[in-house]
Amino acid sequence: MKHLCQRLIWVTVGVLLAGTITQAQEYVPELGPAFLADEVASVRLTLAQTDLDFILNPDNAYSNEEWPGTFVYESSTGTDTVSSVGIRLRGNTSRNAAKKSFKVSFNTFISGGKWNGLEKMNLNGNHNDPSMMRARMVWEYMRAQGYIAPRISHVRLYINDEYKGLYINVEHVDEEFIQKRFKHDHGNMWKCTYPADLADLGDNPEAYKFTPPWNSEQRTYELKTNNTQDDYSAIRDLCHTVGTASDADFQCELEAIFDVDGFLRLAAVEILVGHWGQLHREPEQFLPLRTPFRRSLDDVQL
């Protein structure tokens, strides 16, 4: 007899790739004009020089304050201009790199604002990849194999008319990302960053809402959807099971709440491509997503 349950699947986003198994994905969005596969578009950001100076000041490296500016996207499809976008640095250790990564928000200063269906744009400098190809190759491979992965393209970045170099334009993983791929888009999704090691912190879900000492603005387990409910019980259940289940019961208890097969498939690909910033090595960033699935006695179908 089949019944609806809730289980955590893995959507990882880090230095190289993102994905989980194809059975969980119900829709595959087209690349569209925001993620051109066969040309390099230009992104031009313009903001007050004093605001840019604040963003680039090393003392403000970990600030997530957004500053107003103008976004211009130039490609063979035409030129789009969006005023009153939010601009800030993004990333973790990359914030201290010479080549910064940036986030552009279309809905910070304009409620409901979007560009080509996107609320955010991630412009990654990929400072540790001289080829500027690793991330795109792996993400495109993941998409071709049916894994859930963000759309991606290369762009030229200009800030206040100064050329900043070739950048990777990576689709932002948020509620919009989920809605484009799942019928059930109401699940909870957490952005987990270092030191999120899935350690058992007890029965109180509030214990998992802590922030690291170096960044009081962002929780280590940051709920990215359903923020008003702020329900951390699923993260608590996962950490509690990982930390306390006996050897005899571990497999059964974990599979009841977590897509083990999908995680192992993804981990195999991450090891193959040398992705170091993941849970099996150095947990830099990962995204567990709680989503409904159907389960029977003889099969599990996401």
Outline where the language-model segments fall:
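Intrinsic low-complexity/disordered segments
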Residues: 3, 20-22
